[in-house]
Amino acid sequence: MGQTIRFGVSLDSDLLEKFDALCDERCYQTRSEAIRDLIRNTLVQQEWEDTGRDIAGTLTLVFDHHKSDLQQRLTEIQHDEHDLIITTLHVHLDHDNCLEVLVLKGPAERVRNLAQRLTSTRGVKHGKLSLTTTGQDLA
């Protein structure tokens, strides 16, 4: 981690008032920490757009395990991309529905493609990819 540098920011008073309200709502101790988080979030979003860069994330799927061959198709897709999958969690929500969470890490384009293949598989009721950074380039 580098040296901490102080710098000034000029803001419109209405914008500052809204920012202070956001800081209070999210329990930031200081404006500086809120600004650091905003900068980090912007840098992480930039990582997601770089298709060759490694990213991390989770893919959450909800599906009816009674659907013909669905579990087998999902497993085959996962085995095709096993190097992207760190771990999985399978939960029985009720008699019919399952929730599966995959923790993923790899090149952004491959992670997105895997998520798209799984969520678009016939029988999947809902799929949600949530991306984050590997943390390697953040201070």
UniProtKB/Swiss-Prot annotation:
<dbReference type="InterPro" id="IPR027271">
    <property type="entry name" value="Acetolactate_synth/TF_NikR_C"/>
</dbReference>
<dbReference type="GO" id="GO:0003700">
    <property type="term" value="F:DNA-binding transcription factor activity"/>
</dbReference>
<comment type="function">
    <text>Transcriptional regulator.</text>
</comment>
<dbReference type="GO" id="GO:0010045">
    <property type="term" value="P:response to nickel cation"/>
</dbReference>
<dbReference type="Pfam" id="PF01402">
    <property type="entry name" value="RHH_1"/>
</dbReference>
<feature type="binding site">
    <location>
        <position position="79"/>
    </location>
    <ligand>
        <name>Ni(2+)</name>
    </ligand>
</feature>
<feature type="binding site">
    <location>
        <position position="90"/>
    </location>
    <ligand>
        <name>Ni(2+)</name>
    </ligand>
</feature>
<protein>
    <recommendedName>
        <fullName>Putative nickel-responsive regulator</fullName>
    </recommendedName>
</protein>
<keyword id="KW-0804">Transcription</keyword>
<dbReference type="InterPro" id="IPR014864">
    <property type="entry name" value="TF_NikR_Ni-bd_C"/>
</dbReference>
<dbReference type="InterPro" id="IPR010985">
    <property type="entry name" value="Ribbon_hlx_hlx"/>
</dbReference>
<keyword id="KW-0533">Nickel</keyword>
<keyword id="KW-0238">DNA-binding</keyword>
<dbReference type="InterPro" id="IPR013321">
    <property type="entry name" value="Arc_rbn_hlx_hlx"/>
</dbReference>
<feature type="binding site">
    <location>
        <position position="98"/>
    </location>
    <ligand>
        <name>Ni(2+)</name>
    </ligand>
</feature>
<keyword id="KW-0805">Transcription regulation</keyword>
<dbReference type="Pfam" id="PF08753">
    <property type="entry name" value="NikR_C"/>
</dbReference>
<dbReference type="InterPro" id="IPR002145">
    <property type="entry name" value="CopG"/>
</dbReference>
<dbReference type="InterPro" id="IPR045865">
    <property type="entry name" value="ACT-like_dom_sf"/>
</dbReference>
<keyword id="KW-0479">Metal-binding</keyword>
<dbReference type="InterPro" id="IPR022988">
    <property type="entry name" value="Ni_resp_reg_NikR"/>
</dbReference>
<comment type="similarity">
    <text>Belongs to the transcriptional regulatory CopG/NikR family.</text>
</comment>
<dbReference type="InterPro" id="IPR050192">
    <property type="entry name" value="CopG/NikR_regulator"/>
</dbReference>
<feature type="binding site">
    <location>
        <position position="92"/>
    </location>
    <ligand>
        <name>Ni(2+)</name>
    </ligand>
</feature>
<dbReference type="GO" id="GO:0003677">
    <property type="term" value="F:DNA binding"/>
</dbReference>
<dbReference type="GO" id="GO:0016151">
    <property type="term" value="F:nickel cation binding"/>
</dbReference>
